Amino acid sequence: MGRLRSAAMGALPVFRIELGGQAGHSELHTSLSKNLYPMARLYHVPLSPFCRKVRLVLAEKKIDVELIEERYWEADPDFLRRNPAGKVPILKMNGRTMPDSMAICEYLEEKNPTPPLMPQSAEGRYEVRRLVAWFDDKFHQEVTSKLLYERVNKKLMNQGYPDSRNVKEGAKAIKYHLDYMAWLLDHRRWLAGDSMSIADFAAASHLSALDYNSDVDWTRSDTVKDWYAKIKSRPAFRSILADQVPGFPPAKHYNDLDF
């Protein structure tokens, strides 16, 4: 797909996927024509699981995207004009500005259904949406917000030190969620059924963000570990594994496909 290069845009890093040479330009033109997309622009935060979910869908569907890191907590007026809710991700595409990670993912699925990341049946789509809500609501509230927010976000936002009680609660809660994932994967090939879906990307987005700080006990379930290894080894995951947050080096195994 080319290489990911960082460029400057004000104080924010910008990442562009570039293809070199005449053949590269031809490949880019063919890719854009095939997918009917101009260059998309995604405002994101590297360790945000909601942003990662959108990034994975974009990459899996081979949609070229410009990544712009947005320090949303600074409430920049230009950013708030794009999304008054003050949240990321925000996708700019086809003249539209679109917030909300799941709404973005479903938009991308409907506009570019190959490869499919939602089942054909109403029951299958329901199950994908149920599990995405499970991870983006319940898992996020009980685990991600108590580990990632306390250990990383607080420092980035200058909001003080981690609350040890929240960290302990998150470390305890993740065990239950890993067990639930193991149960699902004992009965299914992927989390929502026989095919990989947005539900798998939602779960992997949260776990990868936590794994950056080594907050996932992969010895708890070989089933979950094997599932994550499959997701982690996909080309769509490469930019996720390349993420770096200043002041927070990733765990040594974070980008190791064999971890």
Segments from the language model and where they lie:
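Short, hydrophobic secondary-structure boundary micro-motifs
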Residues: P115-Q120, E142-V143, L191-D194, T219, ...
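Short Gly/Ser/Thr- and charged-rich N-terminal loops/segments
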Residues: R5-A7, G20-G24, S33
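GST-like fold's C-terminal all-alpha helical module
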Residues: F135-S233
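Acidic/histidine-enriched, glycine/proline-rich intrinsically disordered or flexible terminal extensions
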Residues: Q244-F259
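Phosphate-coordinating loops and pocket residues in cytosolic domains that bind phosphorylated ligands
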Residues: R81, S233, A242
